[in-house]
Design a protein with these regions (language model features):
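N-terminal export leaders
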Residues: 3-7
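Bacterial N-terminal signal peptides
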Residues: 10-18
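Boundary at the C-terminal end of the N-terminal hydrophobic targeting segment
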Residues: 18-27
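A short, Trp-centered hydrophobic/proline-enriched beta-strand micro-motif
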Residues: 45-62
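Extracytoplasmic
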Residues: 48-52, 66-68, 74-76, 86, ...
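An acidic-aromatic
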Residues: 70-120, 182
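Flexible, surface-exposed loop/linker segments and immediately adjacent secondary-structure boundaries
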Residues: 105-151
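Gly/Pro-enriched, hydrophobic low-complexity segments
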Residues: 129-131, 138-214
Length: 215
């Protein structure tokens, strides 16, 4: 079972579109065909019906560094990404922005909104037609929808990869204005499970600190 999981994960990771690997620049919104519009409608409908998600993730950065962890998502707006040991960090949203919490140092700092592309996916009702969709790339099994944001730091792009048959989110790749990338692949995902309320919590006694310079 574990071997099949990682084979599937490798297949999704290999599908990262080539256009997500270049330095980001402004692009005009993409004109959609009727078939593409129907596919996005189906993705919106399916994922709007999923209220909670729980599973594991693999994060890969531009240098190829790999970090794993577990995630918990509850719509609207609640997120917990917990990195595996030896890290004590986790990314938390309780519906009022995103924060990086260090459980060992008992600190927290605000995480830039434009570095959390999953926010496109956290509303109670998902409507990707409202996003600035600039590219679509499709294989037999997966479709990648590339969304673009113009932020104070420059143009940020995210490629969301969905399973064509199930319409489930499998992966996203964030491309920063510098061209640096961060890819999250999801696996062992369970849907519509009960998540303890305590998971979406930031201890008010944790000290607020400035974000690291490279954040």
């Amino acid at each position: 079972m574990l071997r099949r999981t990682f084979i599937a994960l490798a297949a999704v990771t290999a599908f990262i579109p080539a256009f997500a690997q270049s330095v980001v620049g402004q692009e005009a919104p993409r004109e959609l065909t009727d078939a593409e519009r129907q596919l996005i409608t189906d993705i919106n409908t399916h994922n709007s019906g999923v209220k909670t998600m729980v599973g594991r993730f693999l994060q890969i950065d531009t240098q190829g560094q790999r970090i794993e962890g577990t995630f918990f998502i509850e719509r609207p707006g609640k997120v917990l990404f917990r990195y595996n040991p030896p890290s004590y960090e986790q990314i938390v949203s309780v519906g009022r922005g995103f924060y990086v919490v260090d459980r060992k140092e008992q600190t927290q700092y605000a995480y830039p909104q434009d570095k959390v592309p999953l926010r496109q996916f956290l509303d109670a009702e998902i409507d990707l037609f409202k996003a600035n969709l600039v590219a679509i790339n499709q294989s037999d099994d997966y479709v990648s929808l590339t969304l673009q944001d113009d932020t104070p730091r420059g143009v940020v792009r995210v490629a969301l990869v969905f399973d064509i048959e199930s319409k489930d989110l499998r992966q996203w790749t964030l491309t920063e204005p510098s061209g640096n990338e961060l890819t999250f692949s999801l696996y062992d995902v369970e849907y519509d499970v009960t998540i303890p309320k305590a998971y979406f919590y930031i201890d008010p006694t944790f000290r607020a600190v400035n974000a690291p310079p490279n954040t």
